[in-house]
């Protein structure tokens, strides 16, 4: 049987049968002991486990029986982030969860075709966390297991994803695989081994994935930045999957992968055997409804209609009506030339490492706090001229122009204590102007989901933090259209979206700019 995952906002009512049965099944899974592979907490710990945080939130009691050392080593702390495995691992994880919940639904007398719904926060009518997740009781007055106390949003009971918070820009990127040398980080992320640690965010993981985590989870009390127990479950990877909304959020991320795959024939998944059959250093494993361990690879995650997945989505239509990064750029640069830019639209398959060059960087580590923070990036004149000169084939009316250089802003080795922090990032806002008055200068949204773990010096990456890449090619293109050029400096501004205090110690070790020559 093939199951259909439906849009939660189109199920007919706030308390549709799908959500009623989901709530009941969550309650059943929560009754199972932690050591049970099909329990709510075991499944959540596969994404991440932190004894201190779980205890503080009431999900673990000191002395409680844990799974065997073997089960913990194989099943727990598996989630893949800052990696090309981000999408296939989470797909297998969701499929396992969905099958276990469906089994519980059937045991409770529910429908055999129950499927996990998705939360499409890009729908203007569905930007808030669904009402069923915000009520303490179900319609019959019984406890609502979809509700959690540790979900804080903006701190005042507001759980809205505003239009400016997230974008679908990731869908415009043809390259699945990104690099880690300053250029495009890719739709799906950089080539890594098993990566439960930190590194460079892929495009879809950065936006909307990370941002939704931070804005939904939020922070209860900003006065105690060292107390991670004051952060919402969704804000921290080690607690995120304890919140029932996590699964609807990730169903939407998984759906967007399908949208990306279908919207353009140039959008290709990797064909590298190390992705298809990897990772070699640790196998992915999930439990089935009987608790048996099932290993999987990315190869098995490519056809959702086939076993072991067996599902479709209610809507995988293209929300951007065919718009791609190259087409958008072509439309703008046609103002420089009337030439038919045929070669400009050629694609080079699934992506990967492309030659990059450092254009420049700021002078020192900067600290981010509330309000507006800023820094200046000094560019090497000769390197900036290479970017400017890359537009010559367009200006000279070539019939086969080469695409000009792409330019990327890198926020390197971000460290801090506030996993829920979100910033809007702008480049070259006119002096004295409010950045919010210049949406054309906004280059993206920075979310620090996972930053506290990545900042620990005893972590797998030695406290290197996380790195975020934003494409700022449009800024450079606009300079050319204004008959100007990339000069010796760029001004970068960070505008806090939510509560950020100096005590959160958020720093960016280096802000750099790279060019990618195609």
Language model features with spans:
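C-terminal accessory segments of proteins
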Residues: 1-518
């Amino acid at each position: 049987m093939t199951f259909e995952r439906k849009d939660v906002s189109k199920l007919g009512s706030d308390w549709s049968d799908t959500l009623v049965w989901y709530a009941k099944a969550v309650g059943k899974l929560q009754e199972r002991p932690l050591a049970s592979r099909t329990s709510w907490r075991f499944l959540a710990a596969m994404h991440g486990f932190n004894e201190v945080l779980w205890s503080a939130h009431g999900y673990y009691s000191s002395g409680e029986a844990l799974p065997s050392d073997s089960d913990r080593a194989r099943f727990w702390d598996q989630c893949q982030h800052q990696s090309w495995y981000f999408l296939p691992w989470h797909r297998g994880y969701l499929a396992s969860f969905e099958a276990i919940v469906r089994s519980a639904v059937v045991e409770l007398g529910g429908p055999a075709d129950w499927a996990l719904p998705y939360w499409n926060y890009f729908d203007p009518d569905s930007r808030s966390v669904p009402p069923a997740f915000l009520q303490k009781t179900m319609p019959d007055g019984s406890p609502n297991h979809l509700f959690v106390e540790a979900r804080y949003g903006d701190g005042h009971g507001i759980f809205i994803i505003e239009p400016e918070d997230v974008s679908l820009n990731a869908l415009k990127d043809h390259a699945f695989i990104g690099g880690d040398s300053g250029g495009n980080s890719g739709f799906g992320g950089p080539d890594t081994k098993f990566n439960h640690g930190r590194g460079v965010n892929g495009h879809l993981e950065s936006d909307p994935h990370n941002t939704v985590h931070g804005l939904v989870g939020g922070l209860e009390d900003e006065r105690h930045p060292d107390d991670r127990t004051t952060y919402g479950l969704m804000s921290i990877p080690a607690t995120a999957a304890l919140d029932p909304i996590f699964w609807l959020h990730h169903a939407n991320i998984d759906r967007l992968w399908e949208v990306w795959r279908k919207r353009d024939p140039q959008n290709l998944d990797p064909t590298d055997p190390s992705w298809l059959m990897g990772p070699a250093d640790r196998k992915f494993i999930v439990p089935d409804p009987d608790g048996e361990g099932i290993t999987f690879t990315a190869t098995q995650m490519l056809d959702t209609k086939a076993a072991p997945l067996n599902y479709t989505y209610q809507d995988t239509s293209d929300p951007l009506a065919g718009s791609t990064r190259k087409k958008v750029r072509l439309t703008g640069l046609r103002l420089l030339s009337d030439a038919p830019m045929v070669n400009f639209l050629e694609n080079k398959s699934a992506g990967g490492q492309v030659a990059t060059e450092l254009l420049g960087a700021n002078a020192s580590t900067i600290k981010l706090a509330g309000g507006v923070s800023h820094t200046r990036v000094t560019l090497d004149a000769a390197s900036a001229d290479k970017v400017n000169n890359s537009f010559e084939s367009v200006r000279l009316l070539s019939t086969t122009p080469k695409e000009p250089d792409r330019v990327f802003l890198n926020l390197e080795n971000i460290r801090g204590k506030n996993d829920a922090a979100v910033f809007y990032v702008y480049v070259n806002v006119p002096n004295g102007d409010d950045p919010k008055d210049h949406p054309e200068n906004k280059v993206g949204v920075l979310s620090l989901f996972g930053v506290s773990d990545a900042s620990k010096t005893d972590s797998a990456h030695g406290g290197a933090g996380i790195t975020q890449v934003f494409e700022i090619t449009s800024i450079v293109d606009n300079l050319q259209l204004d008959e100007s050029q990339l000069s010796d400096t760029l001004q970068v501004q960070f505008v806090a979206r939510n509560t950020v205090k100096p005590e959160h110690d958020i720093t960016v070790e280096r802000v750099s700019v790279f060019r990618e020559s195609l």
